[in-house]
Amino acid sequence: MTEAGGNGRWPPAGDGARLGFKSHLRATVVPGEAAYLVSQRGVTALYGDHSEVLVPLLDGTRSPDGVLRDAAPALTAEEAAASLRALDAAGLLRLRPAAPESPTAPPCPDPAAEAYWDLAGLDGVHTLDRLARTSVRPVALTDVDLDEVGAACRASGLTLAPPDTEADLSLVLCDDYLSPRLREVDAGHRAAGTPWLLVALGTATPWIGPVFRPGEGPCWHCLATRLRGHRHSERPLQRALGLDGPPRRPHATLAAGRAIAVQLAVLEAAKWLAGVRSSSHGSVNTLDTLGLRTTAHPVARLPQCAVCGDPGLVARRVDGPFVPVSRPKAVHDLNGHRALTPSQMWERYGSLVDPVTGIVKEIRRAPGSPEFVSAFLSGRNLAMRSGTLAGLRAGLRSLSGGKGLTDEEARTSALGEAVERYSGTRQGDEPVIHDSLRALGEAAIHPNSCQLFDDRQLRDRERWNAGGSRLHHVPPPFDTRRPTDWTPVWSLTGRTRRLLPTSMMYFGEEEAPDGLSADSNGNAAGSSPEDALVQGFLELVERDAVALWWYNRTRQPGVDLDAFGEPYIERLREGYRTVRREVWALDLTSDFGIPVIAALSRRTDKPAEDIVFGFGAHFDPRLALRRALTEMGQLLPLVGGVTPEGGGYRVTDPEPLDWWRHSTAANRPYLRADRDAPARGPRDWPYSPTGDLLEDVTTITELTRSHGMELLALDQSRPDLGLPVVKVIVPGLRPFWPRFAPGRLYNTPVELGRCAEPTPYDRLNPIPLFV
């Protein structure tokens, strides 16, 4: 019951043992040509006279000495032994125990099973014996015939564990991997140290795996965390019905499908107990019984898992200071100033895209995208999700996405936004301080320093909120005496810790008790923490500049697209011309001096102009323009199929629909360039490239300080993802939604010479920005 030469001697001692080929091989000799070994994996040819002599003798009826003896006189003992050693070294031979003395004793119980384990790289005879000495216990959490499962186990050589004994492996059968009963199953197996294989039946796509190993690899809670992320739509119903788990789904399967799933589960159990370790044991393996396709979905361990990991990882990261370090730029072109290229980013983080175990189900090209636009979608926008049934219905249109000049760039951008939104969602392990603003003193920042709602908006909040838009929702006045949760953020300008309401820092499913809510303003994923910090800051500057222009309706200088001399610009313009659109751009640069550009486009062939726009900010004006143009392309699929009769919009939100149907360049003159101001080209912005992201961090820190503001950062990176995510906050900078408190919105346009005096509150643009 061993490899023939496993003891290093030749011929091996055997006490009557018989030498022959392994069970998965069938030998055939073609005289004068070769001896052939046929298996499920192909044919092996053995050439030479030695093979023609020895192969017929290796039929398992002779001892090693008998093979040497019968090979003579054609081969000397030394020649035969040398050839046998070569065959043994190739893993082709097996030494079997002597045949049973009783003529009624059964032969090998299952020659095909023995051959299967041989093909797996094991000793088939030894493996069958090992399986007979180990045990498995089926555990049913669903309506399944355990006798049928037990019969399948026995048919594959597995031994069922007797009652009240420990099994070597549990086979847990359920109908949903998020069944609340699995918490108890997981806890019991961790306490006993017993591995268990999870299987879901009762569906057209059965799930098999992984094998959970207490103390090693991911646990059920790691997997459940990822699975819940794909089932947000069930949570409002679960909450409304008071369920402790997801709503039960009706079974949808045939008897044949159930039998296949059971047999595959038993196969995985047998492989595990036999000692085979493959990637399938660490994956959720799905079988599409309609299309007969199997897919492996690797399960990742969450380092911060509260059950099998270190639940304090996130808290320690957030509590500590944000200390930027040197990050040389690997990319310094129109792709951006990054530490990694888009292809490197995708190679490193692309595994996060998986419909079962990833954080985003898929990344796909945006429906309706014209060929000249690279726009991709990456699933639900977690910043817009809701914990109510009504919110769910309203939020089904909200998707995260990505942009770029190429599909690779846009796909990577979409992944980055998905990670950004996921990382910015509250998961329960974030550090908080529960107290009131008054009790916390100077470290705490009043939320309206960031939200910037005017007192009149707060008083008139019912009218503002009547439209139901989450982006334009006005909260109740903040109660400074009421305790709430606060999150530590790091001040790069003050080099100290500050506090902001947690409900403003992380997305949540339910309305927070303090009435506040988070938005994505200043959230960014990057190739490094420094990269994410810089990108988040640039977004704040961009949106502040957009707000100054939009709500004051100032006329801004145009941007001379030809002056940039970029071939991609002409390609885009030609593409827009093919869909009967005009393209232009405006300079929105504010007192921060960082180039901010708005790109706009309108239909030229019908009264409703379906005006779309995009914005971009960067130290390099070429990159600012590129970002504005590619962001504008993300809106184009929503209006690309509009008919002259006014149908074909891909959204139902009233605000963008009203804009597209009624706003034109003529009745919204602030959308057009100021004819009295010269158009801007790339040389009109002072720009000196830097080679290290740390230099950019220093620049934005000092720039913020010079404006009398504070640069705050919250590291939202998740240990299980690895992609850095930072939320950047600069109290006083405007988001581009309608936030009308006193400050920059009124004063800065006057300081820049755009307005002779501050625009009165009641004369601000009544059309809210809807992106």
Predicted segments, located by residue:
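Long, low-complexity, charged/polar intrinsically disordered regions in eukaryotic proteins
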Residues: M1-G42
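Short amphipathic alpha-helical segments and helix-helix/interface helices
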Residues: L84, G150, L182-R190, R573, ...
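Structural alpha-beta junctions
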Residues: A151-P162, R190-L197, T578-E582, E702-E710
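Helix-biased "structured C-terminal domain" signature
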Residues: V284, G291-V771
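Long, charge-rich, low-complexity alpha-helical segments
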Residues: E3, E33, S39-L160, L198, ...
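Short glycine/serine- and small hydrophobic-enriched flexible loop segments
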Residues: L264-W272, G416
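E1/E1-like adenylate-forming module used to activate ubiquitin-like modifiers
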Residues: S156-T159, E166-A261, K271-V276, D288-G320
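A structural signal for well-ordered alpha-helical segments within the folded catalytic domains
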Residues: A259-L267, E530
